[in-house]
A protein has these predicted regions:
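Long, low-complexity, intrinsically disordered N-terminal extensions of eukaryotic proteins, enriched
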Residues: 24-28, 144
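Acidic, metal/ion-coordinating pockets
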Residues: 44-374, 440-444, 455, 611-614
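C-terminal motif of bacterial Sec signal peptides marking the signal peptidase cleavage site
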Residues: 33-36
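Catalytic centers of hydrolytic enzymes
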Residues: 51-61, 66-96, 134, 139, ...
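Bacterial signal peptide processing site
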Residues: 38-41
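Bacterial N-terminal signal peptides that target proteins for export
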Residues: 4-25
Length: 693
């Protein structure tokens, strides 16, 4: 029996649906329990009038990104460090531990693996078939969930289908009834431009029966109404502009909460749980804020908050916690006093908020001071320091086996060969091995289109930028790493991780310098006189470290200088770049429409062509047409280097373990190994770079 509750049933029936969370009770046992609780109205009223306490465990998954299995489709190998099938084991354990649980998903669920792309674009599932991610989640019986930004990556018709229908927007058949996701999807801050109403229901009210302990020590069952409300980042309007513009619009999370939380309370919700597909940012609030958790937590009426989007963790009891802003209490697990949790990503952890509830005989209230939050990780260490992984739930894999194998067969399709290891392990320090072929593919694709269709731009040079999308954020295995030898589709998916589409923008030489200055935020400012170690890499994401990989563009990055003053000697074809000269740059839809932090023009206004084709597909076709990939032709063009400087102390960075030969093969003579383990617990090694070479 699934753990979801059949809404609208009378109290006695509701009670019967509580116990399967803990035990598979037979009819006789259920009847006995009902009798023990009082089978007539007088006894029920007496129990309800007695003060009681209960614990409700809110269980969170977030940013699963379609990682149903602990399986890397880019390497065609098991990876026990992530996967919903292991999180499922933690969920089942929590349900045995806690009498009362509420299981919620926080979005970014339907995109992120080759299996996701297979079901959305390669061999789209029919309306009658449930997405395999949702099918696996159905084995656990989720109570509710919200939508992340990546739910919109495949467009509104697909989203309408996988949610079961009902999205009243232009271009979508809202009457189409499909298999759906299997739980209430809630989202309060995205509206249909057609109806001016929320795209999906802003909230849901779940009627549950709690197992509680009365003041006289007896176990009792008491009803509760739980409000669940969802919010996503307004950035969707930039990131998926091609799908959403003119069809939906967004509202700030705080404004939406101020509107709908009182509605929830008016409808009888005695407890409100906010599902925020966003995280924490100490900046002043704005309605377009990507990570408004600090501000949302201050909205009256919110009792608990689950977070995500940042692929980080809260609470974090490490020596250097991810979040330390004012109002953040990692020890208590609260944000401005509100119990909260952020459960990493990819199924690496289960978030648990233990809400302490009080019943005064008439209504429930939350004792926030007595509540607590924690993360339960699928990977831990034993006494000897060896990694220990939670076992996979055996019920999950069989549910998706046929689609899993179909996706594997698809990504095994051969497309070419490479004579070198194509990797982003050292992209941060100058190896273009996995970047150049992406730039070559994008440049050729855009140049051909302009030649055939946009003669007004035919005289402009066409260049391309790309970034190392996998640069170690998730640990030592989070790098693009394609072995020398045969190339298949899954290798191209490794080279280009996201389902972006190719965009072309028109900029000038001054814009290019500013663009590169923004990308150089990837590095910390290095003090040459400092004797101690200095970390080279900042918190600026690797996927934003845009770079050229062509002999035509050359420049240096001076990391001893502050942000904004690091690009030196920028040339085009051997001459200082003319600030006024115009260029066409091949990039992706995200950068072209939401890259204002790079240059103001990257707000969509500089776009001269928004192609319909995915960057990944463009790379696949390029390799098919040029199947013999070599280092000389496709992996050695370095557009940039660090400005040479001698430092008193070591300049260090982390990358994958046992990877020094990759740096050596790429000609990075200044890179050496300092420690086989950098101490992060993520399977990374510590390297140093001699900036004087």
């Amino acid at each position: 029996m699934q753990d979801t509750f059949l809404r609208g049933q009378p109290f006695a029936v509701r009670l019967a649906f509580v116990f399967p969370r803990r035990h598979a009770l037979g009819a006789l046992a259920c009847a006995a329990l009902l009798a023990a609780c009082g089978g007539n109205d007088d006894d029920g009223d007496s129990s309800a009038a007695t003060p009681a306490t209960a614990t409700l465990a809110v269980l969170e998954t977030t940013d699963l990104h379609f990682n149903v299995r602990s399986f890397d489709y880019f390497k065609l190998a098991e990876d026990k460090t992530y996967g919903f099938e292991r999180t499922a084991t933690l969920v089942r354990a929590a349900r045995k531990e806690f009498a009362n649980t509420l299981l919620v998903d926080n979005g970014d669920t339907i995109q992120g693996t080759a299996l996701a792309d297979y079901e959305a674009t390669v061999s789209p599932i029919p309306c009658t078939q449930q997405l395999t991610m949702y099918k696996a989640m159905g084995a656990l019986g989720f109570d509710a969930g919200t939508l992340g930004n990546h739910e919109f990556n495949y467009g509104l018709p697909f989203l309408n289908q996988v949610l079961g229908g009902g999205l009243e927007v232009d271009g979508v058949d809202a009457t189409k009834k499909c298999a759906g996701n299997g739980y209430p999807a809630v989202l309060a801050n995205v509206y249909s431009s057609k109806t001016k109403k929320p795209l999906v229901q802003p909230y849901t009210v779940l009627e549950r029966t709690l197992v509680a302990k009365s003041s006289d020590g007896k176990e009792v069952q008491l009803p509760i109404k739980i409000g669940v409300i969802g919010f996503t980042t307004p950035g969707i309007m930039n990131w998926d502009k091609r799908f959403l513009e003119g069809k939906v619009y967004t509202e700030g999370a705080v404004e939406a909460a101020q509107k709908y939380v009182p509605e929830l309370r008016a409808k009888g919700a005695q407890l409100v749980v906010a599902l925020l597909h966003g995280g924490l940012d100490a900046s002043s609030y704005s309605p377009t804020m990507e990570n408004p958790g600090l501000h949302l937590s201050k909205v009256p009426g919110i009792d608990a908050m689950v977070m995500g989007h940042q692929h980080s963790v809260f609470p974090d009891l490490s020596a250097q916690p991810a979040f330390t802003q004012a109002g953040v209490d990692n020890k208590a697990g609260t944000i401005n006093g509100v119990p909260a949790v952020m459960a990493s990503s990819w199924g690496k952890a289960l978030g648990v908020i233990q809400l302490a509830l009080k019943w005064d005989g008439k209504a429930w209230s939350v004792d926030k001071a007595a509540s607590k939050s924690e993360l339960r990780n699928i990977q831990t260490k034993d006494a000897a320091g060896a990694n220990v992984f939670v076992a996979a739930d055996p019920a999950v894999a069989p549910l998706i086996e046929s689609q899993h194998q179909a996706a594997i067969n698809y990504v095994k399709t051969p497309i070419g060969n490479t004579d070198f290891r194509m990797s982003t392990l050292f992209a941060d320090v100058g190896d273009p091995g996995a970047i150049q072929i992406v730039n070559q593919a994008q440049q050729a694709y855009v140049a051909a289109y302009i030649h055939a269709n946009l003669p007004q731009y035919a005289q402009l040079p066409v260049l391309s930028v790309s970034a190392p999308f996998k640069s170690g954020f998730q640990g030592g295995k989070d790098f693009t790493d394609v072995a020398a030898g045969p190339l298949a589709i899954y290798n191209a998916a490794d080279l280009y991780l996201y389902p972006n589409t190719v965009y072309a923008v028109k900029v000038n030489g001054a814009d290019i310098k500013d663009w590169l200055e923004a990308a150089a935020k990837r590095f910390n400012q290095i003090d040459p006189a400092k004797a101690g170690e200095q970390a080279l890499i900042s918190t600026f994401p690797g996927y934003n470290f845009d770079m050229f990989t062509t002999a035509d563009v050359q420049y240096e990055i001076d990391v001893t200088q502050p942000v904004g003053s690091r690009i030196k000697g920028l040339t085009y074809k051997g001459q200082p770049i003319d600030p006024a000269q115009e260029f066409v740059i091949a990039t992706n839809n995200y950068r072209a429409t939401s890259g204002k932090s790079f240059i103001p023009k990257l707000d969509g206004s500089a776009t001269i062509w928004a192609s319909p084709d995915a960057n990944r597909d463009v790379v696949i076709e390029y390799v098919r047409k040029n199947p013999q990939v070599t280092r000389v032709a496709n992996g050695a063009a370095k557009s940039w280097r660090f400005t040479q400087v001698t430092t008193a102390g070591d300049v260090v960075f982390s990358s994958g373990a046992d990877a020094l030969p990759v740096a050596q093969a790429a000609g990075l003579a200044g890179v050496s190994l300092l420690a086989a383990d950098d101490g992060s617990g993520k399977g990374m090694a510590k390297y140093k770079i001699d900036l004087s070479k």
